[in-house]
Amino acid sequence: MPYIKEIIKYLEGGNNPFYYYIFTFFSAITLRNFVEFMIVSNAHAIQWHHPVHFSLFYISLCLSIIILLYLITREKVERIARVVAASFIITPIVPAIDLLLQVVWDYEIKYQYMIPEKTESILKNYLLFFGNHAGATPGIRFEIFIAMICCSFYVFYKTSSLLKSLLGAILFYSLVFWGYFAILFSIQGIERLAGLLYDTSPKTMIDTYLFLAIHAFLLVLYFYNRAYMTAVVRDIRLTRILHYEMMVIFGFALGYPDSGRFFMSLSNIMEIYFVVLSVVFAFIFSAITNNIADVTIDKISNPDRPSVTGVIPWETYNIIGFTALFFSIVYSLTAGHMILFLIICFIGVYFLYSMPPLRMKRIPFFSKGFIALNSLIMLLAGYSFHGKEITSFPPTVAVFVLICFTACSNLIDIKDYEGDKAAGIKTLPVILGLKQSKMIIGIFFAVGYASFPYIMKMPDLYAPSIIFGIALLLAINIQPYKDKIVFSLYLLSSISLLGYLIAKNINK
């Protein structure tokens, strides 16, 4: 027992940089994949998606184990992560043991466990994992057994509780079995309940593990530092993200009527979810870079932002931003190369708008064309989700979006009037004065809403559109100005009009 404590202390110690443990983890699982590919009987069938699929499996599993051990021990997440990441060095043992036994017993190695079509009873497999039944190879069983013992020792070392130690081993095994070994049963069950096609293709498996990995990762980050996560979430500018997400859904609805494609499998659902997720991450990156450039202005207009309060150190704040950028690119790529291209365009346009050296937001009025362009890009992202070419997007709608949102996006400068004025940024409110600019921007909204039914060729929307436009005109000019009320009314009106459009298109 003492030597186990020494191993844990060594792995938890801060003498080695954390990225050493990350590289150790990836080196271990890469070695596992390499050895497995070399010895399996159907190695000739290995394709590009196999290492991707398997690596994502291990990444999501590693994160899930960290969460489990944190909930049981309440140890610091970073310490747990160091131990768990290094512990994956046992994974290459599996193919090594199976290869040795193959030489002795001459049996065929096949890593095909818990296949729905070949599994008699999932509960029996769970209860008799170490028993005499077809499924996991001896190497896998040995690996799980060793991992359960290690988990039990770690929990006991941290809690000094035999009960928690036993519970930790059982919960670890249950997590691995029900959360990962039985994943095909979960996919099959969800697809049956939703009336979707049964699909366990490599794309579905990759999407599934990406889904598990990102949510586990975010939960690990939350447990690591709640203050950082809370600060980022509070500064997420929810109303603006919702605007862009609605543009994606609007584009999806525009592309639906003559595409004939809808959600046919679980993978289709996850693809559109990943588009939504990539937009969120792209906006987080853009918001963080904008905050870094706007510290002087935000000290006056937005003193509660993390860049002003200092709740997150600058170095960490930058890391969070580029991590969000990384996830935005990864998850947009899963939805297709066109989505990836459009997300990169979205990020680039926002960078040109808010960041030096160009910092185009300093150009009065017309700089909002960058925001309008990003709105159009999100429309195209939803539209192209159906596999349609963006060149077939209705040109009248594209022109309407560019003109209307260029004019209406000046709304965001009302709240920042004092900060922009102090910083010498010539926005419409700074040039014309707050009262006059609010009236002009309100008129932009009223005209835009009144024009929407004409552009969309939906005359039955004239009455509600005009009502919403007038309501926004009044809300913008109410004293004192309430940013949340205006954006809430905008989102409510947009959701209502969008809901009508979707319902009409689906019923065609």
Language model segments and positions:
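Multi-pass alpha-helical membrane architecture of UbiA-family
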Residues: 1-508
